[in-house]
């Protein structure tokens, strides 16, 4: 095999197509089931300061910085009062926030039932699967139902058809992730152990900690959580409960089909179609609550987001492969058409009469309605070809030519031509290398040159006129990259195969 660049850059027009196992021909129908149940638990827990140690290090930090101590820790009398408060409301060590957000023994189960069989000319494989997984972090649950079908049909001696389609429905509950300011796990790591999880049944609250009741509403479920007293983090348990009021659902349909016609033993035509369709729906609700100055929402908010994405690709190729003595000649001609369309509609409103989840509908809001959305479309048409020559599996040469037209660029700059060429010499097959065959089974020297296009820009970006950053430039087209490479590929003796590649490459973007 002789390749020049990644096939998705040079020849392969179908960059995204569903591909799974096919049904078996001439097999009796077989029904199978596999599944599992399990439990997940973090194997390692962070060691956090208890309440007494937290006070000690908090005072030490203030003293070393030449600052006044926090009033609650300034005197031994206050410290004793704080530790008494902690002991009666959270236990002697205080709140271990990591434990409060972790779901020990998170249950998970998966089930899959499949049917596989066929006749002499038709094979079918169909499977139905269900997954239900509780997250290790509370509130991060996941459910999925998937249905996959694969079809394999031998229409005649020279004509065959394969097709597959998969449908996946996912439902998720999310937590705030990857945000050092508000993330649930970050908050659990940064919240102090003095603060109890809840504030609705506290006892022996020192007067200098009375701010823990700021904004407290006894009849508001989301107001029962304590605002963190000695850091700017949010109460992670309350945050999880609020985010549980929002649901996220996704639907995916992925399908592909390939019609193959062997015109002659040396000439083959393929027509491939692929699609990738997705839909997503977010039903969001942010309740009204106040825990402290860092953790509050003045109004409850109803949010609904709908988005869709459609991707289609249709590719036609005509391939030629024939041998003449020690010569092997290959050629390929093809065309590919791709289209992507995306749209999104987002709506929100505030001022729902209460925090009842049943009232979390857009029509129930009274203030600050907002609607936004956008469409996005792009397409690409490609023509490509390849010629390869192989003599005695020792001397190999290949040339590719690709012409792409992308709707992302301005008129007059939509099309680009991208040639590439490579050559290789399998010197391990030469007669002067016979003495090495006991330890070197394959060694090849190759060199290549290729021009690679790049359409990784936003659609319509060329229409931008003014901007304040380097990214707001008028884009007539995207840079091309010229790549020159050379290398040696070796494979050790087949009985103890060890392979390696030594290569060098130079790229220039213009």
Region roles according to the model:
Residues 15-19, 32-34, 162, 446-448:
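Soluble periplasmic/extracytoplasmic beta-strand elements of cell-envelope proteins
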Residues 2-16, 23-29:
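Flexible, glycine/serine/threonine-rich loop segments and coil->beta-strand junctions
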Residues 20-22, 35-37, 117, 320, ...:
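Flexible glycine-/small-residue-rich
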Residues 43-79, 168-226, 339-355, 443-487:
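A surface-exposed, glycine/aromatic-enriched loop/edge motif typical of exported proteins
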Residues 23-138, 176-179, 195-247, 260-262:
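Residues embedded in well-ordered regular secondary structure
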Residues 84, 293-294, 406:
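Extracytoplasmic gating/loop element in the C-terminal half of outer-membrane beta-barrel translocons
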Residues 8-12, 140-143, 177-179, 436-441:
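Short, glycine-/polar-rich solvent-exposed loops and beta-turns at beta-strand/coil boundaries
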Residues 109, 144-146, 150-159, 164-169, ...:
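Extracellular/periplasmic, surface-exposed regions of secreted and cell-surface proteins
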């Amino acid at each position: 095999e002789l390749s020049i660049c990644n096939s998705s850059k040079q020849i392969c027009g179908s960059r995204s197509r569903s591909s799974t196992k096919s049904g078996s021909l001439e097999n009796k129908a077989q029904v199978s089931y596999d599944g599992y149940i399990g439990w997940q638990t973090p194997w390692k827990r962070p060691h956090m300061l208890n309440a007494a140690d937290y006070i000690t290090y908090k005072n030490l930090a203030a003293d070393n910085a030449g600052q006044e101590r926090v009033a609650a820790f300034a005197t031994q009398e206050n410290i004793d009062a704080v530790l008494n408060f902690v002991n009666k409301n959270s236990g002697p060590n205080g709140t271990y926030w990591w434990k409060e957000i972790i779901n020990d023994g998170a249950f998970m189960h998966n089930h899959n039932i499949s049917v596989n069989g066929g006749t002499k000319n038709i094979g079918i494989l169909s499977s139905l699967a269900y997954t239900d997984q509780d997250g290790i972090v509370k509130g991060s649950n996941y459910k999925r139902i998937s249905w996959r079908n694969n079809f394999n049909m031998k229409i005649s001696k020279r004509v065959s058809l394969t097709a597959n389609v998969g449908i996946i429905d996912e439902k998720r509950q999310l937590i705030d992730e990857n945000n050092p300011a508000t993330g649930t796990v970050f908050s659990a790591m940064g919240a102090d152990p003095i603060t109890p999880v809840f504030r609705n049944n506290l006892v022996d609250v020192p007067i200098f900690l009375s701010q823990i009741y700021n904004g407290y509403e006894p009849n508001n479920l989301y107001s029962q959580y304590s605002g963190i007293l000695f850091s700017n983090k949010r109460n992670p348990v309350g945050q999880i409960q609020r985010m549980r009021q929002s649901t996220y659902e996704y639907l995916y349909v992925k399908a592909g089909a390939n019609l193959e016609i062997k015109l002659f033993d040396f000439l083959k035509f393929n027509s491939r179609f692929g699609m990738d369709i997705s839909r997503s729906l977010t039903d969001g609700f942010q309740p009204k609550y106040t825990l402290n100055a860092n953790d509050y929402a003045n109004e409850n908010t109803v949010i609904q987001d709908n988005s869709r994405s459609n991707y289609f690709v249709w590719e036609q190729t005509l391939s030629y492969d024939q041998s003449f003595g020690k010569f092997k000649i290959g050629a390929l001609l093809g065309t590919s058409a791709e289209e992507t369309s995306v749209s999104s509609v987002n709506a929100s409103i505030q001022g729902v009469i209460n925090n009842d989840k049943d009232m979390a509908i857009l029509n129930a809001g009274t203030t600050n309605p907002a609607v936004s959305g956008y469409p996005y479309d792009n397409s690409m048409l490609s023509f490509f070809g390849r010629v390869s020559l192989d003599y005695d599996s020792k001397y190999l040469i290949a040339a590719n030519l690709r012409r792409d037209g992308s709707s992302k660029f301005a008129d007059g700059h939509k099309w680009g031509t991208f040639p590439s060429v490579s050559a290789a010499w399998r010197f391990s097959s030469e007669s002067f290398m016979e003495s090495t065959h006991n330890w070197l089974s394959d060694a090849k020297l190759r060199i290549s040159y290729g021009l690679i296009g790049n359409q990784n820009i936003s659609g319509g970006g060329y229409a931008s006129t003014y901007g304040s950053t380097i990214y707001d430039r008028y884009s007539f087209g995207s840079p091309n990259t010229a790549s020159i490479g050379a290398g040696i590929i070796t494979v050790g003796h087949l009985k103890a195969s060890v392979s390696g590649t030594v290569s060098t490459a130079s790229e220039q973007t213009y």
